[in-house]
Structure formats: structure tokens, C-alpha cells
Amino acid sequence: MRASAYALAAALCAVPALAAAQNPVSDAYRGIEDHQAHNIVAAVDMFPAGKFGYRPTPEQMSVAMVAVHLVEEGNYFLCSRATGVPEPQHAKVDTTASKEALVAALRASFDFCHSSAANLTDAQLADSVQSFGPRKTTRAAMLLITVGDWEDHYSQLANYLRLNGMLPPSAQPRRGGM
């Protein structure tokens, strides 16, 4: 009898841990999205308004071009395809928009990525979704493409910051020590 009570108590204690581990991939994606949203928005916001046209070479995207790409071709499109949540109506931005407008649009696009993935489960990752053009792929592949796009453009922005004598957000000293 006593052994049964201990077994029941142990099982009940394990339930929250099991429930939390039911969507490890989707949960990891949400964590990466939060992290990248913070770093990318902070990186763009670090540039003075007069530097939004900066690009190291004529062939590369400017800071404003990166921000517009992430808003218009990146976050709304990719997060919608990855999660199945339709893109919301939003004011279009282009490279002539003010720094404030570009940062606000970027933040809003990441807010959409965050909210659209809130109910995403690992069970949905094998679902077939529209990719680019007529192609289909899995929801998981679209999530990976989205994360890859964030990583690519954060690296680009971090390099632009360093080339302008600034330390990117991910290299900033952490508050409170380590």
C-alpha cells in the first residue's frame, strides 16, 4: 500500500515535466524567435538614423534594406507560411521610411511571428504547407528557413555595427555580471 502511494506521488510529480516536454521543437522555435526578435530589433535600433543607408559595398543590402526585407519578405510571409496564420494587414514600409517607422514595423512583424506561433505544436510540424511559388514543404522546413533568415540577417547587421565601431547586442556585456 505504501509503495503504491509513493508510486502515485512520483507519477503526479512527473506530470508537469512530461507536459512541458510535449513540444520541444516548437518550444525551442519560440525561444529562438524571442531571442532573435530582441537582437535584430535592438541591432537596427542601434544605428543612427543617418546610417540607415549604410552598406559596406554597393552589392550589399543597406541597414534599411535589411529591415524592409525582414518585414516585407521575411517575417510576415515566412511566419505565416510556417504557422498557417494568415498575414495581417499592415502598412507597407520601404527604405525611405524613417528609422522610427522601420523599427516599429520590424517590431510589429516579430510580434506577429510570436503570436502566430503561440499555439504551434510538434504534432503539426510534418504538415504540408505552401512554400515559395507552387512548391510545398513541411511546416518544420518553413520554421528552419525562417530561423535561417533571422540568423543570416542578424549576422549581417552585427557586422555592419562592428564596421561602424559599435558592439552588437549579442556581444554586449550582460547585466548583473556573467
Named regions from a protein language model:
Residues M1-L8:
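Bacterial N-terminal signal peptides that target proteins for export
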Residues A14-P16:
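N-terminal signal peptide c-region/cleavage motif recognized by signal peptidases
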Residues A20-N23:
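Boundary of Sec targeting at the N-terminus
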Residues R30-V41, K51-A91, Q130-M178:
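Short, contiguous alpha-helical
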Residues I40, T95-Q130, T137-H153:
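Acidic/histidine-rich alpha-helical segments that form the ligand environment
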Residues V44-D45:
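A short alpha-helix/helix-coil micro-patch that ends at or immediately precedes a cysteine
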Residues P48-F52, A82, A118, D122-L125:
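Short, flexible helix-adjacent loops and helix caps
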